């Protein structure tokens, strides 16, 4: 356990990793953090400031001023000519922070200036460090070395100690990290860990401690995945942790403001970790190969059409979801942050479109719930104002569906179990055909999509195919109801309402299915009352639907008329 944690600490970067972890650890073991890392402001050498016992002075209460560095400290880190090097930063603390920035209520406390690093001080500069400490130590100012070993001990004795984490959870945690190269096994053990942590979680500090255990365990798992060059389990676990963290925050109505604020910060950390690992997986790892013909289909390393199809839809869905997160965050941001998020959104859309163009399997959804990934791609295109660029994708899907339904060849089914999918189709008999197509959300989604992009001729052909070949199919949509908010994030159970569509026979001149869908949205408003939607976190609901394989509610189906944004350029086209 110590080795796992020590390697994790050693790998942490200074910004957005070590400087995020340290305040969490200090808060957990009883320190009062009075200064957090800032961006764009003068720090005067101090990354984190906290009041608490000095472990090197028999627990005497002191003001700790932390200077944070990643990895090992060598000669170039000590005084290599940059203002942010260790020695200039220590001088800045002495001459600026201490005389000018310490709050009055802490001014009489002894001061511990702590050089905090993920690794250790190398021998080549050890003498410089000792000389500096001896020269500048006074009765009220002393210097401390907080190396990776101390941080690992702090994690193990605090957040991940045996009493707090428990034997079963520690075993689940260790297995999830050890099996990171076996994604399904690693994910299963991490889910066991997270289930144990949030079960009957308290509203007080003990509950917040459990959340900190969750996020630190996740950080370590992600670090192990990066080290092993396998991001599958870390990505899935980040999604799961984000959903669970939101559920805990959403249930914290009885918590004090201090605890609620701490839990909101933890949620932000998990979201940042998801965005980071998503960028590594989608933009950095998949992106460079997305525009190469069959490259990612070949990367699946399977001759099975099913394996390739499932893997490519998974990749497209992840790209679309990551893009939607950056879209919603970007719209709320300003200046450079806004530009950065919207640029990443455009990258994600371009990657998803390239996947479609270069991997024809994406025009052949084998599962009915692949409407989730298709719907998210369309929603992302709408956000960018580029729906017209991906309409060809929808038309190609429907054209192929017409053929597959009539010839009863590799048609999409509502089955989700891999073994059933691997056997599908068992035969072409009427009995099996009806059994495997008895319900569908994909079909009404595609009908509405064709109507909204005004592909009227293709829509007419598709409706005729469905009427003649699938008269027994129940076409339906799923909408949340009161109480869905209690179950969807953690359990992912379908606590909603299934509505058969069309609600009445659509004859020539009657109301369109798209109009009926608009009426359903108008009449079933529970989605708009869901906690995440009310707080502007629509991508969180999309993530829950995709992660737990719940149908995409019609409230979140794309609208062509709402997609045009004059300030946005059209995206890349998805052609056949």
Predicted regions, residues:
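Mixed-charge (Asp/Glu-Lys/Arg
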Residues: 1-576
């Amino acid at each position: 356990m110590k080795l796992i944690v020590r390697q994790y600490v050693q790998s942490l970067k200074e910004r957005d990793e070590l400087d995020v972890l340290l305040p969490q650890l200090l808060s957990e073991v009883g320190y009062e953090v009075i200064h957090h890392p800032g961006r764009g402001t003068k720090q005067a050498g101090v990354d984190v400031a906290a009041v608490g016992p000095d472990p090197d002075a028999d627990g005497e209460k002191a003001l700790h001023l932390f200077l944070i560095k990643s990895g090992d400290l060598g000669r170039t880190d000590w005084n290599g000519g940059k203002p942010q090097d260790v020695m200039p930063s220590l001088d800045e603390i002495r001459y600026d922070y201490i005389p000018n920035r310490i709050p009055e209520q802490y001014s009489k406390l002894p001061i511990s200036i702590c050089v905090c690093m993920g690794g250790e001080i190398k021998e080549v500069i050890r003498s410089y460090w000792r000389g500096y400490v001896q020269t500048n130590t006074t009765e009220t100012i002393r210097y401390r070395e907080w190396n990776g070993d101390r941080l690992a001990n702090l994690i193990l004795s605090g957040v991940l100690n045996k009493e707090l984490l428990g034997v079963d959870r520690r075993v689940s945690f260790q297995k999830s990290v050890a099996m990171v190269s076996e994604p399904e096994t690693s994910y299963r053990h991490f889910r066991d860990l997270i289930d144990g942590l949030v079960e009957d979680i308290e509203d007080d500090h003990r509950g917040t401690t459990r959340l900190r255990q969750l996020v630190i365990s996740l950080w370590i798992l992600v670090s192990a995945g990066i080290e092993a060059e396998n991001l599958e389990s870390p990505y899935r676990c980040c999604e799961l942790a984000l959903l669970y963290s939101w559920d805990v925050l959403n249930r914290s109505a009885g918590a004090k403001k201090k605890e609620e604020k701490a839990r909101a910060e933890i949620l932000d950390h998990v979201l940042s970790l998801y965005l980071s690992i998503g960028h590594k997986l989608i933009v950095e790892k998949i992106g460079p190969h997305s525009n190469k013909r069959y490259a990612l289909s070949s990367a699946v390393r399977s001759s099975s059409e099913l394996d390739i199809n499932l893997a490519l839809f998974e990749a497209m869905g992840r790209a679309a979801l990551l893009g939607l997160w950056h879209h919603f965050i970007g719209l709320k941001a300003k200046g450079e942050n806004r530009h950065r998020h919207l640029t990443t959104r455009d990258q994600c859309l371009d990657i998803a479109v390239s996947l479609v163009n270069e991997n024809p399997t994406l025009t052949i959804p084998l599962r009915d719930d692949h409407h989730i990934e298709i719907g998210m791609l369309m929603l992302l295109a709408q956000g960018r104002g580029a729906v017209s660029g991906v309409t060809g994708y929808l038309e190609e899907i429907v054209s192929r569906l017409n053929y597959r339904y009539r010839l009863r060849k590799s048609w999409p089914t509502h089955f989700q179990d891999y073994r059933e999918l691997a056997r599908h189709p068992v035969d072409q008999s009427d009995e099996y055909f009806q059994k495997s197509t008895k319900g569908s959300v994909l079909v009404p989604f595609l009908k509405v999509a064709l109507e909204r992009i005004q592909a009227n001729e293709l829509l007419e052909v598709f409706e005729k195919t469905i009427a003649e070949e699938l008269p027994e199919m129940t076409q339906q949509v799923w909408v949340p109801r009161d109480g869905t908010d209690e179950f969807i994030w953690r359990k992912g159970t379908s606590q909603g309402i299934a509505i058969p569509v069309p609600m009445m026979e659509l004859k020539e001149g009657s109301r369109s299915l798209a109009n009926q869908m608009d009426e359903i949205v108008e009449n079933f408003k529970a989605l708009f009352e869901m906690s995440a939607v009310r707080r502007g976190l629509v991508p969180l609901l999309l993530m829950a639907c995709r992660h737990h394989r719940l149908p995409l509610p019609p409230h979140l189906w794309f609208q062509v008329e709402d997609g045009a944004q004059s300030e946005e350029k059209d995206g890349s086209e998805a052609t056949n």
